[in-house]
Structure formats: structure tokens, C-alpha cells
Amino acid sequence: MKPIKKLEGKTVAIVGMGRSWFDYNLAKSHGVHFDEVWAINAVADVIFHDRIFMLDPASRFFDSDDAGGQTESMKKILKTHEGPIYTCQLDERAKGLVLYPVEEVVRDLNCYYLNNTVAYAIAFALWNKVGCLKMFGVDFTYSGNLYFAESGRGCVEFWLSKCQGAGMQVEVANSSTLLDTSIPVEDKLYGYHRLDDPKVIVHDQENKLRVFNRSQIEGKIDEEQKPVLMDRYDT
């Protein structure tokens, strides 16, 4: 497989099954534009999408209940979907399957750290030189629940860092713990968060990251955190 030229420079949403996938619905309802939407596994049964990433073999869903609640949804998708569904093995029971270009991706990106399906999707975006990647429903951990976490967060954040290093714009759903996005602004920089006047990170007018003491921009932060209320007259 060769890189898909039409993806170069485009804006792509990757939507997983974590809690912050609701932010995707909110973004769509507010007119946020995506050139393509890539669904992770059974999310494809719920939202419109252009591509599915399912790195498990289809037999996991057809021949076992190992996927739990995803099993029936994935069976339905696999039986009827035209594709592309990127996976590790073709199966005659699912006509939409396409082999993931793992040889090309590993060779061209010189990296084999791929321990979950989302990481494969991000690597595919990097390989295809996507311009902007927006992450929804990719959370792994949840604030307030110290006893639950899914494996794979480190791998996903590693690939997002590689994307940023290559010049790709990366955005994460506001409610997601990925890249510490949902952490309060004054808690993002470890150590400084313990100070009476903590350091905070903001974007300047050129959209570059700047670091200030909270006291320097207190009013601006508070104003941005206030909800915007609209009445029936849009005022």
C-alpha cells in the first residue's frame, strides 16, 4: 500500500469508545469540520465515518465473545460494511476488510511501538501526512477513579508526540485525560502547581504556547471558563 494522497494536509477526527466521545457529538452539532472521521472498532456502529480501524482479526468477533459488549455490534458491522476496515488479517466473512500497511508504516516511520488499535490509527495519520488530528473518546484513565485504567495510553501519547514533532496539529477533546487535557490549567505544570501563584500555559495571538503566572492573566482565564448563555433571541 502507498500513502493516500488525498489525506495529506487534511483534518481527521479519530473517535474511540471512551467517555469523551460525547465531545465529538458536541463538536459536530456546533459545525466543527472534519475532512474524514476514523472510527475505532464498535464506534462505527454509532457515528458516520470514513474508515474503521479494527486491528484484531475478525475471528475474534465472529468466533468468540472475547470482545464482550462489542461483539454483536462488530458482527453486524463486519457482515455489511463496504470498508475500508483496517485490520491484521483478511476474512471471507467480511468483505470490507483491508490489510493495515504495517510493513510500510514501520519501515517509513522507523518505529514499531504499536500496542493498541488507536496507536495504529495515529501512525496511519502520520504516515499519510495528515495536517490536523482531533482525538475524541480516547481517554484510558478517568479523574475520580483511581482503580480503573486501560493499557495503551503511553503508546498513544508517544505517537501523538511524534505527530506534533512532524508539524501536525494535534487537538484532544476537552473532557479527555489524554495529554492531561482535562486537568485544570493551574495544575498542568508539575511542581509549579504547588505554588500560591502557579504557572499556567496559554496560547498567544499567534497560537504559540506561553507560560505566565496565574496572577498575570487571572481575569482572562476566569472569563474563558464562564459558560456562554444564549436565549431564544440568540443574545
Regions found by a protein language model. Give the residues of each.
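Metal-ion/cofactor- or nucleotide/acyl-coenzyme-handling active-site neighborhoods
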Residues: 1-235
